[in-house]
């Protein structure tokens, strides 16, 4: 574990000691090396925990998420270069330091063995994200978005802390490895139902569940590009990761407590997909599509069968790369036409034919078309939902149709049509941007060849 965390820590002095011209190059190239080093975690012969120390361990569920975190840091740095070049050198270095500290905290969160340690790190990721949104956001509403983000997360987290302390007193340990072997089960009572709610609510808000999702579109729309990327790709996955981990403890209760939440998430999936159809803001559309994809993950984690866990883990990784790619594309549009409104960006296919190809590929991946891993994740989830209740196939069908509709709407409004008159003096696509899109897309397609790497705990 130290071979990832220590080099990541050393990126901080590297950032501050590099000369202004070399800062971005140095940090990006070294963070790429770290992300390649993290791939060695995939060499696990079985599905047991791989202990690094008493504090840190990795297993088939946390490994793909750790690698995704390490993979996204260089991509975020590549995406942010253009948008930060007006800032002075100290601010640029501070921004890079925030991203690096966020990566370190996230890697430690995913590899923590103690639930209290996980909780502390889970909350600590809030601070750099909040600073990134409220300091480097584009519009003046960024403070409002930051406050929404902070309070939604904190309101969910306080009951979780109380619940974890209760479990510690009750069971005597919060170590995940020991908990998975304890035969301690919770009996059905009002207090235990409340304990279940307290444990799950923090993660459901983070996911986010439909109804407590209002912070997400706000935070996404106001965040700078790196903020949007890390929020969509990894911070939402903290919620689903926490839910899978804590479901060991709450075992028999989930069977009947999950019903309202599965129904709410399936209903929310259709509602948020429908909301996408009437968005005018490109980033907002991508944010709402994230909510509808994560609703599927919530439903599949709540069903608690091996297939549904596999589908949830696959869709988590697939959605992380896809939504991050879509935000990068939206940002490349924003840097040229200085507006997120979709109607202002008509006919871009005429000017940037290669970018239009990336738009098409990203939308098809978002639609879960083969050969992307989104398809596998959604197939696993659809099958496990269908075996849970036949009725869900109707909701899934409606959702697939609406997803197709908003993906078409997104492509047709931004890429097709007649060029608007205000588009003059547009910069061509940079190699940096095209490399960035490729580095998102290549893992998505290549993982199809060996999906067992990301199927999580049930290899």
Curated annotation (Swiss-Prot):
Keywords: Electron transport, Membrane, Mitochondrion, Mitochondrion inner membrane, NAD, Respiratory chain, Translocase, Transmembrane, Transmembrane helix, Transport, Ubiquinone. Signal peptide: none annotated. It is found in: Mitochondrion inner membrane. InterPro entries: NADH4_N, NADH_Q_OxRdtase_chainM/4, NADH_UbQ_OxRdtase, ND/Mrp_TM. One of its GO terms (cellular component) is mitochondrial inner membrane. The chain crosses the membrane at residues 23-43, 60-80, 90-110, 113-133, 147-167, 194-214, 224-244, 257-277, 284-303, 308-330, 350-370, 392-412, 434-454. It is a multi-pass membrane protein. GO terms for biological process: aerobic respiration; cerebellum development; in utero embryonic development; mitochondrial electron transport, NADH to ubiquinone; mitochondrial respiratory chain complex I assembly; proton motive force-driven mitochondrial ATP synthesis; response to ethanol; response to hypoxia. Belongs to the complex I subunit 4 family. Core subunit of the mitochondrial membrane respiratory chain NADH dehydrogenase (Complex I) which catalyzes electron transfer from NADH through the respiratory chain, using ubiquinone as an electron acceptor. Essential for the catalytic activity and assembly of complex I. This is NADH-ubiquinone oxidoreductase chain 4. The gene is Mtnd4.
């Amino acid at each position: 574990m130290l071979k990832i965390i220590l080099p990541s820590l050393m990126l901080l002095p590297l950032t501050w000691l590099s000369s202004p011209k070399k800062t971005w190059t140095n940090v990006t190239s070294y963070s790429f090396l770290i992300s390649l080093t993290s791939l060695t975690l995939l060499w696990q012969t079985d599905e047991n925990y791989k202990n690094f120390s008493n504090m840190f361990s990795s297993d088939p569920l946390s490994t793909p998420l750790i690698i995704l975190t390490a993979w996204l840091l260089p991509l975020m740095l590549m995406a942010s270069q253009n948008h930060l070049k007006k800032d002075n050198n100290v601010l640029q270095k501070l921004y890079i330091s925030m991203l690096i500290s966020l990566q370190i905290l996230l890697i430690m969160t995913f590899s923590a063995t103690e639930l209290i340690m996980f909780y502390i790190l889970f909350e600590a990721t809030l601070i750099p994200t909040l600073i990134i949104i409220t300091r480097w956001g584009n519009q003046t509403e960024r403070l409002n978005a930051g406050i929404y983000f902070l309070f939604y997360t904190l309101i969910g987290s306080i009951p979780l802390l109380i619940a974890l302390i209760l479990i510690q007193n009750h069971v005597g340990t919060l170590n995940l490895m020991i908990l998975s072997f304890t035969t301690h089960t919770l009996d059905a009572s009002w207090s235990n139902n409340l304990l279940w709610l307290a444990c799950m609510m923090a993660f459901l808000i983070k996911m986010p569940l439909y109804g407590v999702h209002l912070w997400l579109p706000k935070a996404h729309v106001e965040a700078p590009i790196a903020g949007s990327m890390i929020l969509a790709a990894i911070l939402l996955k903290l919620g689903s990761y926490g839910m899978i981990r804590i479901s060991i403890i709450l075992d028999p209760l989930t069977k009947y407590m999950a019903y309202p939440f599965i129904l709410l998430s399936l209903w929310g999936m259709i509602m948020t997909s429908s909301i996408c159809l009437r968005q005018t803001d490109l980033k907002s559309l991508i944010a709402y599509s994230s909510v509808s994809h994560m609703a599927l993950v919530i439903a599949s984690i709540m069903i608690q069968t091996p297939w549904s866990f596999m589908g949830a883990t696959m869709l988590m990784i697939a959605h992380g790369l896809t939504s991050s790619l879509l935000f990068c594309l939206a940002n490349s549009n924003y840097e040229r036409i200085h507006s997120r409104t979709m109607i202002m960006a008509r006919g871009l296919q005429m000017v940037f034919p290669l970018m239009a190809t990336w738009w098409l590929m990203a939308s098809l991946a978002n639609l879960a078309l083969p050969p992307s891993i989104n398809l596998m994740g959604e197939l696993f989830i659809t099958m496990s939902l269908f075996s849970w209740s036949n009725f869900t196939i109707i909701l899934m069908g409606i959702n697939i149709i609406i997803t197709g509709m908003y993906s078409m709407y997104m492509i047709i409004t931004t890429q097709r049509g007649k060029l608007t008159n205000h588009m003059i003096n547009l910069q061509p696509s940079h190699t940096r941007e095209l490399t960035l899109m490729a580095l998102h897309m290549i893992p998505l397609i290549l993982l199809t060849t060996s999906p067992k790497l990301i199927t999580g705990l049930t290899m």
